[in-house]
Amino acid sequence: MSSGLRAADFPRWKRHIAEELRRRDRLQRQAFEEIILQYTKLLEKSDLHSVLTQKLQAEKHDMPNRHEISPGHDGAWNDSQLQEMAQLRIKHQEELTELHKKRGELAQLVIDLNNQMQQKDKEIQMNEAKISEYLQTISDLETNCLDLRTKLQDLEVANQTLKDEYDALQITFTALEEKLRKTTEENQELVTRWMAEKAQEANRLNAENEKDSRRRQARLQKELAEAAKEPLPVEQDDDIEVIVDETSDHTEETSPVRAVSRAATKRLSQPAGGLLDSITNIFGRRSVSSIPVPQDIMDTHPASGKDVRVPTTASYVFDAHDGEVNAVQFSPGSRLLATGGMDRRVKLWEAFGDKCEFKGSLSGSNAGITSIEFDSAGAYLLAASNDFASRIWTVDDYRLRHTLTGHSGKVLSAKFLLDNARIVSGSHDRTLKLWDLRSKVCIKTVFAGSSCNDIVCTEQCVMSGHFDKKIRFWDIRSESVVREMELLGKITALDLNPERTELLSCSRDDLLKVIDLRTNAVKQTFSAPGFKCGSDWTRVVFSPDGSYVAAGSAEGSLYVWSVLTGKVEKVLSKQHSSSINAVAWAPSGLHVVSVDKGSRAVLWAQP
């Protein structure tokens, strides 16, 4: 520290350290000051005795010399003087011995004091080092304290800003909520008015149609009456019903009035219903029963009568989508093939012979397709998507009919129930939702506790496969789990045999299992040395007669197992260059289609 600085200019802790050093100096100096003074006096006395000793030694050597020079001198040395000198020498010798002893003690004391001083010097150095370290620590702590104060101020400012923003958002939310309520009320009122107007319009159209029908009927009756006045030749074997005119003498004369009027009445009874159906179709409100049955399901047969063939060759290879293909499904009549991919589209293909011809594309999804399902009539197509929604299209006109939103995660599977009027969807948000297509609302939401990867349905039960390695069986009439079955890996896919008595599962432990639903036990397990499940949504399938199961592997091979023996029936490879995501077996039993993580789809058949 500079001597020019005043004590008040130093911080308090520096003044405290200086005072402690001065106090320690005073204590240590007072303790050793007397010793040092005595030691100094002893040194001086020792030096004096050394000088006297040297002088006496010199005199001792001089006296014999003088005695030899003057041995006859009687007055110089006498007996008393010799005796006195001897006593003096003995005394000096004793004093010298005592001085040497004290000198040794003082030397040892000096050594001890030097050791103590060295120890104190070391302690002083250590204390100075600690003081320097403490000073550095204090400086760092002051810097940290300053930084923390700055951060605290920044956090207080940020917190205040967030609080202001929260208050503003709360006010905005309250206003928007009120606006939403008013908008909902207005929308409900508009819907009510719209429905009333539509009812009035329908009544008006029905009335006009009835008037038109009456006019046409009256005109037709008039024409028939005029035609009845003219005689018509009738052959004996003609099957037109003959009406006998009781006022005529010619009983053989016939008239077609009765037959024609019956046919006309039948034709006139149709327009009203057809007109109402067309009005309903304009607004996309056709019911499931109002859709005509497609031609491709007219030739379907029971599973027992199908000629199921294990495919052996790739009959047709094509790029189905621009990117990964996640789902594939045949229509109930095997004529249409639907594929869904990450390009957000569902594509329809017509499968005939050994080829697939592109028919059209179903658009409307905002993210990749994860699952595809036809209804039992093949008139509707249901697709689940990564945009948290499921959608329904009509197959005949490719129109989007319904969008089912409500999940908070991507929808991984959606299936029709057997009545085709309800839908079950499973999502990554760990919930299952039951939808009613008549009211177009979600009627039930069930929390499963784990992400749902696939769903299959029977009349009264929904089976779901989950990320937590469990298959859950749900009662549709309640929201409870009837039972659970845990496997060794995450469940990726489920499928039912045609009789709906056996459940096929695929899991990430590279095993396929057939579970007997009547005994709730694993009936058969399928595996192969080269088979490996490629993803968490790898789909597997039963054959239409339930005799085989098919699944795609991560290396791009298609495996077919026999349910009866549990052995691999066929391995089809060399067509896919990436992992197979899904497999579909045509209801006719003649074709199998596999799709992969690339863009490729392969139609397999037996020549």
From Swiss-Prot:
Keywords carried by this UniProt record: Autophagy, Coiled coil, Cytoplasm, Endosome, Lysosome, Membrane, Phosphoprotein, Protein transport, Repeat, Transport, WD repeat
Summary of the tissues where the protein is detected: Widely expressed. Expressed in the testis and sperm midpiece (at protein level).
GO cellular component, one term: Atg12-Atg5-Atg16 complex
Region (WIPI2-binding): 207-230
WD repeats: 320-359, 364-403, 406-445, 447-484, 486-525, 532-573, 575-607
Chief site of localization: cytoplasm
SMART domains (alphabetical): WD40
A GO molecular function held by the record: GTPase binding
Consequence of substituting T300A: No effect on the stability of the protein under normal conditions. Enhances cleavage and degradation mediated by activated CASP3 and CASP7. Results in reduced autophagy and defective clearance of intestinal pathogens
Post-translational modification: Proteolytic cleavage by activated CASP3 leads to degradation and may regulate autophagy upon cellular stress and apoptotic stimuli.
Coiled-coil portions: 79-230
Topological category with respect to the lipid bilayer: Peripheral membrane protein
Top-rank taxon: Eukaryota
Self-association state and partner proteins as the record states: Homodimer. Homooligomer. Heterooligomer with ATG16L2. Interacts with WIPI1. Interacts with WIPI2. Interacts with RB1CC1; the interaction is required for ULK1 complex-dependent autophagy. Interacts with ATG5. Part of the minor complex composed of 4 sets of ATG12-ATG5 and ATG16L1 (400 kDa); this complex interacts with ATG3 leading to disruption of ATG7 interaction and promotion of ATG8-like proteins lipidation. Part of the major complex composed of 8 sets of ATG12-ATG5 and ATG16L1 (800 kDa).
Family: Belongs to the WD repeat ATG16 family.
Job description of the protein: Plays an essential role in both canonical and non-canonical autophagy: interacts with ATG12-ATG5 to mediate the lipidation to ATG8 family proteins (MAP1LC3A, MAP1LC3B, MAP1LC3C, GABARAPL1, GABARAPL2 and GABARAP). Acts as a molecular hub, coordinating autophagy pathways via distinct domains that support either canonical or non-canonical signaling. During canonical autophagy, interacts with ATG12-ATG5 to mediate the conjugation of phosphatidylethanolamine (PE) to ATG8 proteins, to produce a membrane-bound activated form of ATG8.
Record protein name field: Autophagy-related protein 16-1
Source organism of this protein record: Mus musculus
Gene symbol of the encoding locus: Atg16l1
